[in-house]
Structure formats: C-alpha cells, structure tokens
C-alpha cells in the first residue's frame, strides 16, 4: 500500500526526509526531463513560502517504508485566466515505475488543490500519456 505524506512548510522536513534528500530524489529520478538542483530548491522554497501569492505543497510517497515518489505543486496566486496551481515536478523511482504510483501522486495532488491545475510536459515524455488519462489536455502551444 502506498502512503502519501504532504509537506507544505519547511518545518515538515525531518530526519527521515530532509529538504536536500527531497531535492536529490527529484534530481535523480526526473532524469533528462528534470532541472538543476537549484531550480528544484527554488520550487520547494516557493511551495513552502508564506508570502502572499505564493505557496503550494510537496508530496512524498512511500511503499513499504521506501521513498518511491515525489511531487511539487506551486500556487500561481491567480485564477480565472490562469490555473491556480502548477504541477512543477513529479517523479517515481525507476525501480517502482509501472505500478501506478505516479498516477496516485497526481490524483492526490488534484484532490488537495482547490482550483485548476496545469503542467508542462515535453512531447516525448512517457508521462504525457498518464497526464492525458488523468484528464489533462493541451490547450495552448507555449512559445
């Protein structure tokens, strides 16, 4: 059974999962679709911010006490014309892919969010099919 833990402030990190371990996990498991560790850290800091217009949350997924997946949502501080939430990163350990853990993380994030959720995905990213199955669709071409 998958256990999903929500973090939304810096104090939520603990010895079992430090901020640096969260960053390292995403950096490793995002692979060629990822960003620098510095960019990942900025997204975490934004999600954990109390500043007006910022915020969000992180999810950490555990299977048999092993960290198997992570996700970051950043709030946009906008609504009506831009979705209120942006799914910045989601990654599953390659040893645990194909078990539905990525889908469970994304579904949980949608449940938690109040308002619309958007994301960017590269055309050749295999996760694109998962997002489409979960109801995401291409509305705009970004240029």
Q: What is each of the regions a protein language model found here?
A:
Residues 103, 118, 123-142:
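Conserved active-site alpha-helix within GNAT-family acetyltransferase domains
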Residues 81-94, 120-122:
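Conserved acetyl-CoA binding element of GNAT-fold acetyltransferases
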Residues 96, 100-108:
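Conserved acetyl-CoA pyrophosphate-binding loop and the N-cap/start of the following alpha-helix
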Residues 28-35, 46:
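N-terminal first-folded block
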Residues 46-60:
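A short helix-loop-beta-strand connector motif used in the catalytic cores of GNAT acetyltransferases and
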